[in-house]
Amino acid sequence: KTYLVTIPAHKFLHIRNYESIGYWDFWQRQSQIPGQDCETICGLLESIKGKLDDLGGKEANSGSGQVMAFINAPEGRICSWGIPLAEAYGARLPADYQGEIPPQMRLMDVPEGEYIVFEHGPFDYETENQAVEEKIEAAMKSFDFSAVGYCLDTTAGRVFYFYHDCTRYWK
């Protein structure tokens, strides 16, 4: 399903990569940077209190408040939509967050914004993950923004979040 939501202003604590293409490539590249491998970053994010999307999940995914994201970035790689971006992994935090920032991570302010959500319900990770990813990507690529009176925001710093928890959804 596709729907619109307003996401309030918040902060995004994350690491980013300007060359990676997808989740596995992202973590492979990050593992080459001291202190930025998956286990270290997920552990640091797990220790952060007050994550906006933390539902108390035990796995390093959207249920525990950890999300993958694209950030519009002029110095990033050109994605399949023709937009330069960086891939990022992190957690959304309250706009007034004053806690610790691990030295290998970045904290950015994200203004309130209208977001289009492309959502797929629960699925079997082992047998359906690739097909679900392809469906979400196809829906995003073919979406007619003019039909809802919007256009794709390519402003530098704009964030696209990806919530992946196969027991609930991919959006």
What are these regions (language model features)?
Residues K1-K171:
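A solvent-exposed interaction/effector surface
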